[in-house]
Amino acid sequence: MSSTSSNPDDGDTTEQSQLGLDTVIKKLEDTILSPMARREDRALTVRGEGQRASPTPVPARIREIVSSSLGEEPLSGLREPPATTSHAREESELLQEELTRLEDLLAQADAEREELASRCHMVSQRLQARLDTTEARLRKSELEHSMDLEEALSRLEASQQRSMGLSQVNTLLRQQLEHMQKANDTLARELTRATHSLVHLQRKLELQESQRLSLRQPRDILPLWRQAKALQTHLAELRASTERGLTDVQADMTRTAQRLHMACLNLDSHLRLTASSMTSDLEQRLREQAREMLQLQGQWAAEKVALQARLSEQTLLVEKLSVQKEQGERAILTLKSDIQRLKSRRSGGQLAVDELRDEVESLHHVLASIKEVAQSDAMCPELAWSSSIEVREAQARLRSPPRSVSPHQRMSPARTSSPTSLHPALQAVQAAIERRQQREQELRLRLESSQEEAAGLREQLSGYRQELRTSQRLLQDRAQEHEDLLGQLEAQRQEAQLSQASVHLLEREKEALETTMEELRAKADIREAETQKLEVTNAELRRSLLLRAEQKAELAQQSERSLRELEASQGRVEQLEEKVSGLRKELATSREALSSMQLQRDILETEKESLHGALAQAESGNADLELLVTRLKAEGMEQQDSLAKMAALLEGLSQDKGTLNHLALQLEQERDQLREQQKMLQQEQAGMREQLTQTGQQLGLIRAERRSLKETCGHLEQKQDHLEKQVVLLGQENAQLREQVGQVTNKKQALEKQLAQSLQDQEAQMDILQEALHEKNTLSEERAQLLAKQEALERHSELVTKEAADLRAERNSLENSLFEAQRLTTQLQTQQEQLEGKAEAAQLARRALQVEIERLKSDWEVRETKLQLHLGQLQQQAAQQEQEAQLALERQELAHTEDLARLHREKDTLSLSLAEEKEAAARWMEQQKELLTRSAADREALQGEIQNLKQERDESLLQLEHEMQQALSLKDAEKSLLSKELSGAHRELERARQEAQNQQVQAEATVTTMTKELRTLQVQFEEAISTHQREADTLREKLREIAAERSSVRREAEELQAQLNVAHERLAELRQELQASEESREGLQREALGARRALEDEVQEKDVLQHSNTELRASIHRAEQEKASLKRSKEEQEQKLLLLQEAQVAAQKEAYELRTRLQELERAQRDTRRKLQERHRQVRTLEAENQRKRQEVSDLQAQVSRDAQHRQKNLQESLELQRQVAEAQAAHDGVQKEVLGLRQKLAEVEASGETRAKQLEGHLCESQRAEQTLQAELCRITRKLQEASNQADSLQRSLDNACSRVHVLEQELAKAEGARCNAEAQLGRLWSTLCSGLGQSRNLLASPKRPHSPTTGSSQTRPGRQRTSPPTRSYSPARWPSPVPVDPKSEVIDVAFVRDALRDLVQGLLEAQQERDNSGIQVANLSSQLSEAERERLRLQSRVEQLQRDLADAEEGQRRAESALQSAQAARALQKEALQRLETEHLASARAAGQERRRLQEQVDTLRQALEESSRPSQSLADKGRLLEQPLQQVLPHSRRDRAERRALREQTTSLRTERARLQGELAALRTRLIQTEQETLKKEEDRAMLGAKKELLLQSLSHLHQEVDGALRQSQQLQVASLKKRLDKEVWQRQQQAHSD
């Protein structure tokens, strides 16, 4: 019954088991062959039974195993139990094979993970590279933008300088226009004078006619008529000549206006072209920069998209993990359904039911715990700990005894699990869940790191956006600067427009002058018509002369008028003499202009010397500026074109000037013709007198015409006043132009100051110097043109002197004409009886004139005394100024000594208080600035006083000349009156012809004797001149010898300069080598930074791993002990480092204090030297001005003495000439004595300068030795740097090897973990299927068997990383004994084998993790060693930089020595004209040099001490590096012991990084100090250039003094000859008058 009843139950159970197996198999196939499964899971194969069986897929093999186990009948199971054992063995073998396959699959998954990690690394590297490239592009764009802006600024400066040159050309053109206006004014004056002379002649004619009519002498009318006719012809010729001159002037004015217009148009076009080109260039550059910015934005957008893609990939990975988690949950549900089915199947047998119930309950509990763990895992990963607690509760429930169902169960107490037993499936599930939690935790950490990276990238993006904003702001600023530049260009255009407006004003003035000339022409035409009317009236008068004899009285009045006109002609002669005086004034003004031009030339030469010095400075940096020179060549070509245009303009102006000179010569020729016409007029006066007898009837008309002429003269005077007002306006415009020129000069000075500042700031602005050199070339060309103009002015002055001589000759000819008139008066001697009374009256007048002459002499003597008093006052003032200058110098010397003492005291007190010293230095600098301002104000005041004195002297000279001219004019008037009286006397004394002839013979004899005496005097004078010239030649030869000596000294200086240049070149080579070493060092730094970044990335990853392995490290107490010991050693090392750092900081502070002291002392010395030099310059200028004043006073005294001598007789004149020759010889002797004294002083100064030069050369040798020692130390330190770099490279290689090993270990670990997880999953699935199948087979047995320990639920344990749970406790294997002896050992052996394999696998994983940790520790150790090596390299680098500083200090000392040598040479050149007080200053400078030498020695000692102190910490660090290399060798075999050292070494690396940052700050400070020293050297070179300029100024002043002495001698000779000629002429004339009177 039982059997029959059991059959259908068995069928049902078989059917149910078959369905359950099908569902399990289907589930396994879905998990393995589903589309969500991986490729490796689908391709899993297992070998069949036997070794030669072909590999079959895992699901097929599982079906075979299950179907074979289920297809057997239960009886066969009872009959053949060994088959089941063999079948279990085969299944165990299959499981082992599956485990190997799963391990392979895990390895492949790890490889894929590694590929993903490598891809992430590659992406990060690409992002970093893109960031670097973008940064480089931004820097490059900023550099290019700054270069473009600098070029734009240089172009603007060039345009400003061009505008300055054009403004100078405009000033020259305006000056020439002023000269032309002056010439026009002189012509107008001559016209007015001619009209006045006409009126005067008419009056004279009227007077003569009235006199002759009163004397009833109609014969005089004929000569008067002739004179009137000649006057008319003369007027016509004068009119024609004036018209010709005016037409020529008009043509010249039109030409100049056209040229000016063309020049202005060219200037405007050039300025527009330059402005447009500059604006277009700037716009193009801005567009390019905007494009680059857009490109950068696009790149950043692409990088942002890549980062977003990376984030999306990470999110997809998270979603995949969540899907896998859901699949695990589904697998758990399917397992629950399978278990329920198994429960329904196993209700067939009682024993089996009891056992199955127990097993089902246990499995149910296990599944419940697994479900709770999975649900907690699915709900929240943070509930992992609670799930583990529930699992433990489940384990406790498993360990509790099950409920009893039957008495059989009570009889078998062995069914209850032992308290130490735990289900292996639960263990596997817990381990899988823990691993999954670990994985999830790792993924979360990676997500957090990726988010942090994304945040960092966002921050970088924000930083780059800020940089973009700053760059945009910079672009806006640059655009603003561009607008400012455009505004400046518009201002320049406005200036050009103003110049054009001034040109238009000049053209309008020219047109006004042309209108006035046309008006004058119209008036001249009116006068011609009036003269024609007069001729007609004269013809009518001739006809009516016979009928109108009654009007003789009116004719007499007419003769009086003619006499008045004669007097007017004499007045015209006086006016001509006044014109001569005006020409003399112009000559004086031209001389003043020449002197001003010479001063300008001197200034230009000084500027040239200063620019030469700047060029000498710039030559050292030309290697860096060759690229800029190539860019500036195009601009130079444009400037050359503009210069060529300007040269063409200047040539045109010179041609215009030549035409003006030609016009002036033509006017002079016309003036000569006018004078000849005047002679003709005087000859034709007789004819005019005859004609005037016939003009008696038309006297009323003539008077009316005279009134009209007077009105016209008034109009002309008004026009002249108008022209004078215009001249005043032009003078005001000239003053405005001068003010503009002053502003331009101020701008030029400001630009020069800016140039000096730019030289001090950076060598990057040397292109401005090159442009200044181009401008210097233009200035030299302008100077050549100015010299040509000066020569032309000199020629003009010579022409003026020639004209003066011609005027004198014309005056003599006029006197001859007067004599001829006197001869004509001999025909009228018939009237002698009537004119005896007149002769007596003439004698009375003569006596009165003699009285007046005596009065004039007394007035002249009074003026001479006044002048002498004035000269004495001037001399006293000069002496007072000299005394004040000497007192000021003495005060400055005292102040200098006091300042030196105070500086010494401050040097002693510097160690106590640095702040007080800085405040004192600031106060001292302010005082020095105030002193400089005061000295500048005093100098300006002195210059103003000197200019006032010069103006007063010039005004006094002009007044004297004017007074002399007035006296001469008075004398000429008296002469004319006397000639009139003599003519009357000759008319009255016709009887005394014979006596007059005898007197004439006597006069001729006296003339011959006087001429002989004059010839002898001339011979003597020529001999004196020849002797003077010989002496001058000897002096010139001596001066040439002195110049030769100077040239030799210059050659020596040039040789020294060449040596210095060689030294500079060597220094430049050394600097280049240092720069190359710095570049290599920077490359190493970049490589170290890259390695450091990679290390930091790896350290971050390893930190994550360490965080996951903290629980394993907690069990290692030995590592903690080692960590404590390492901490102690680290603290000791940190204390040592702190002590070393404090010592280094103290040494650096001391060195810095010493350097600041030395720098302040050097600044004080430079300021004092500059002050002394300025004072010396002021003294020299005052002495030169005093000498000039003395020369001028001596010239004035000589002129006064000459005037006094002219009043004496010829014999006294000869004696005075001899006395003057003796005085000249005495002066010559005095000059020779002074020259000898100066030579002695020069010899003394040269000897002292040579001694000082020797001292400075010794100083230079010492500095060169120090430099050689420093170079040797530098070479040694460079070797150490190379060794350190080699060590760093070796460490880097070992670090790379360790990193690669770490990567390999990580890959292996990941593979092992993946393989373990897959194997556990597969084992769980297989074990569940086997347990279900074997349970069904055991259900048919009589006695229960011990079930295997299944590991169900592995399907839900997909690999997912989460937080680590506490370590699971190891339990003993669950052994369930059964009463049936069915060889349980085989099954136990199989389960133990699986457990052992799992344990081995876990042990392997633990060992792999330990190896990974050890490799991380090794990497950390290697990174710390590499950081230490880098620190060592940085310290060596700091040592190199310190040596560079020492070398720079040595170079600075050498430069100081060079500057001192150059200052000695300049002092040698300057002291050639100085006085004895310069010797004391020289001694002071020698003392200062000795002090400098001591200071340099002290500085060298301090630097050596600093070097020794800095070498000590470097040696200690080297020892430390050696000590650290030993543990580096010991790290590899003892890797497991050094885990705790990693943290300590990290802390040490952080401290070393802070120290590195501090050292970098010190390096930046040292670089700033290097820049400051270079600026100081540049300042010294500028001072040297200034001294050279002063030297050349002194040489030029010597040459100017010689020229002025020669010119004064020539002027004295010319004045003596002229005075002798005048006196001889006066004596001859007086004798002739006496003869005529007798």
UniProtKB/Swiss-Prot annotation:
Region (Disordered): 1-21, 39-92, 396-423, 1168-1213, 1338-1383, 1506-1551
Lineage: Eukaryota, Metazoa, Chordata, Craniata, Vertebrata
Any single Pfam family the record assigns to this protein: Rootletin
Comp. bias intervals (Basic and acidic residues): 1180-1193
Biased composition (Low complexity): 67-82
Keyword Coiled coil among record annotations: yes
Protein name: Ciliary rootlet coiled-coil protein 2
Protein family: Belongs to the rootletin family.
Sequence ranges of Polar residues compositional bias: 1-20, 406-421, 1349-1371
InterPro entries with a match to the protein in the record: Rootletin-like_CC
Entry-linked PANTHER family: CENTROSOMAL PROTEIN 2, CENTROSOME-ASSOCIATED PROTEIN CEP250 ISOFORM X1
Keyword list, A-Z: Coiled coil
Coiled-coil regions listed: 85-144, 426-1234, 1281-1315, 1412-1506, 1542-1576
